[in-house]
Amino acid sequence: MMRTVQLRTLRPCIRAQQQPVRAPTSVAAATATTPAPTKKCPFSLFAKLGGREAVEAAVDKFYNKVVADPTVSVFFSKTDMKVQRSKQFAFLAYALGGAAEWKGKDMRTAHKDLVPHLTDVHFQAVVRHLSDTLAELGVTPGDIADAMAVVASTKTEVLNMPRQQGAESNR
């Protein structure tokens, strides 16, 4: 069963909301449902993971694993990895509470050219690489679980699944 991470779990000092943390389906949705972190809120998962330097290091280590894995490396063969790392950092900063807004594409749009070739097998490989990376960097099991719950909440959009189907398969 997938954990549903409530916004209050990730940002306890910000007024709790009832919606689970989800990757935005649009920029408007992102800004409408996600309050901005403040300097008074050092408890975001982004901060707990070590902030900018730690998350950048995690992104670098994560993509080293991804491009070495034949299961998923094919999706990055024509990708400028410097640009990809920058996009991933920006998304994680937003999703983990370290940035007030996400200015990138929604997850469905960002991954649409990969579908139908992108499957749950690929999604799970990427999740595993991120989880392994965080563990190798000394992140606590609880914080890894919270981060993985945020990542899992993007599955429906990344794989372009009908929203109801994705909600059921994430449980």
Swiss-Prot record:
<keyword id="KW-0479">Metal-binding</keyword>
<feature type="binding site" description="distal binding residue">
    <location>
        <position position="63"/>
    </location>
    <ligand>
        <name>heme</name>
    </ligand>
</feature>
<comment type="similarity">
    <text>Belongs to the truncated hemoglobin family. Group I subfamily.</text>
</comment>
<dbReference type="GO" id="GO:0019825">
    <property type="term" value="F:oxygen binding"/>
</dbReference>
<dbReference type="InterPro" id="IPR012292">
    <property type="entry name" value="Globin/Proto"/>
</dbReference>
<feature type="transit peptide" description="Chloroplast">
    <location>
        <begin position="1"/>
        <end position="23"/>
    </location>
</feature>
<keyword id="KW-0813">Transport</keyword>
<dbReference type="InterPro" id="IPR019795">
    <property type="entry name" value="Globin_bac-like_CS"/>
</dbReference>
<dbReference type="GO" id="GO:0046872">
    <property type="term" value="F:metal ion binding"/>
</dbReference>
<keyword id="KW-0809">Transit peptide</keyword>
<keyword id="KW-0408">Iron</keyword>
<dbReference type="GO" id="GO:0005344">
    <property type="term" value="F:oxygen carrier activity"/>
</dbReference>
<keyword id="KW-0349">Heme</keyword>
<dbReference type="InterPro" id="IPR001486">
    <property type="entry name" value="Hemoglobin_trunc"/>
</dbReference>
<dbReference type="InterPro" id="IPR009050">
    <property type="entry name" value="Globin-like_sf"/>
</dbReference>
<keyword id="KW-0561">Oxygen transport</keyword>
<dbReference type="GO" id="GO:0009507">
    <property type="term" value="C:chloroplast"/>
</dbReference>
<protein>
    <recommendedName>
        <fullName>Group 1 truncated hemoglobin LI410</fullName>
    </recommendedName>
</protein>
<keyword id="KW-0934">Plastid</keyword>
<feature type="binding site" description="proximal binding residue">
    <location>
        <position position="111"/>
    </location>
    <ligand>
        <name>heme</name>
    </ligand>
</feature>
<dbReference type="Pfam" id="PF01152">
    <property type="entry name" value="Bac_globin"/>
</dbReference>
<keyword id="KW-0150">Chloroplast</keyword>
<dbReference type="GO" id="GO:0020037">
    <property type="term" value="F:heme binding"/>
</dbReference>
